[in-house]
C-alpha cells in the first residue's frame, strides 16, 4: 500500500521538461498519482514549484481507474496552451523559447524586443 499524492507542478523552464518520470508542459501541470519517491525528486529540483493538493493511499493503481475526471483534466491541460506572462521570463529563457520556435533574433536584443517577437507567432489571439 503506497502513499500517493495529488500535486500541481509549475514548470517555468521549457516545454517537455522531464523529471521523476513525468514530462511537463510550460505552466501548471496537475498530477494525480505521485509516489513519495517521485515527490521527493520533484521537490529536490529547484527549477520546479511543487504544491501538494491531496494525499491518499492506493492499492495496486486502482485510484486512476476510479477517477476518470482526473484524466479529463490532464487532457484539457495538454490541449490548452498554458497562459504564461512573458515578463516573468529571463532574457535567456526568452531566447531559448524563440530558438525552439525557430524565430531569429539579434543576440544583443533587449527583453522588450524579444517579447515583441512572440506577438506574430501567437497571432491567433488578436481579440482582447
Curated annotation (Swiss-Prot):
Q: Where is this region: Disordered?
A: 53-87
**GO MF, one annotated term:** DNA binding
Pfam families named among the record's database cross-references: FluMu_N, HeH
Top-level taxonomic group: Bacteria
Question: Per the similarity annotation, which family is this?
Answer: To phage Mu protein gp35.
| Subunit structure comment from the entry | Monomer.
Query: What is this protein identified as?
Result: Mu-like prophage FluMu protein gp35
